[in-house]
């Protein structure tokens, strides 16, 4: 392995596979080779770690910090590589300088990964993409206690209001980062 120099920039990208998918070692090795080859065009490299089969962590690094455009291209490419695995979530952490701070990038990617559930599958979330979203505003009164409202409709056997309420709940929380 090559020596990592001081001042290297790192960005952690985490892919969470669907629970029912288990990627084989050979598949992952081929995938890592493809990603490494792609990253060479940007003068970047990758340290790969697999966590509990479902969480695939790519620590992307190089001398220069990734621009938002480069990060978007890298994230899109990595996401496409996992298309054969079916549904997956993907997020990138903040860029940090020096290897001893990589955990900070990883931790910020984990936090963003938690938000992926509110976005369409395969949406590549970054701090920048979240920042560009307009806030949804305060929770409407009728969504303040969703469990009470939903159980009221459910217990009354009111099918149409149940579906309308769930649609409203989905609309409010879909792509909502707040």
Task: Give short role names for the model-derived ranges.
Residues 1-178:
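Hydrophobic, helix-rich cores of sensory/ligand-binding and other regulatory modules
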């Amino acid at each position: 392995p090559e020596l990592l120099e001081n001042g290297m920039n790192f960005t952690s990208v985490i892919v969470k596979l669907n629970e029912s998918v288990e990627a084989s070692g050979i598949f992952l090795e081929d995938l890592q080779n493809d990603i490494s080859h792609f990253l060479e065009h940007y003068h970047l490299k990758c340290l790969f770690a697999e966590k509990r089969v479902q969480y695939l962590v790519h620590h992307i690094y190089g001398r220069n910090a990734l621009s938002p455009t480069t990060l978007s291209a890298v994230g899109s490419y990595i996401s496409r590589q996992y298309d054969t695995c079916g549904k997956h979530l993907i997020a990138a952490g903040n860029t940090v300088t020096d290897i001893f701070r990589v955990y900070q990038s990883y931790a910020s990617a984990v936090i963003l990964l938690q938000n992926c559930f509110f976005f369409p599958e395969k949406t590549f979330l970054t701090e920048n993409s979240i920042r560009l979203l307009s806030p949804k505003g305060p929770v409407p009164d009728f969504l303040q206690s969703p469990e009470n409202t939903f159980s009221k409709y459910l217990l009354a056997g009111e099918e149409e209001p149940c579906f309308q309420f769930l649609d409203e709940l989905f609309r409010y929380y879909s792509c909502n980062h707040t």
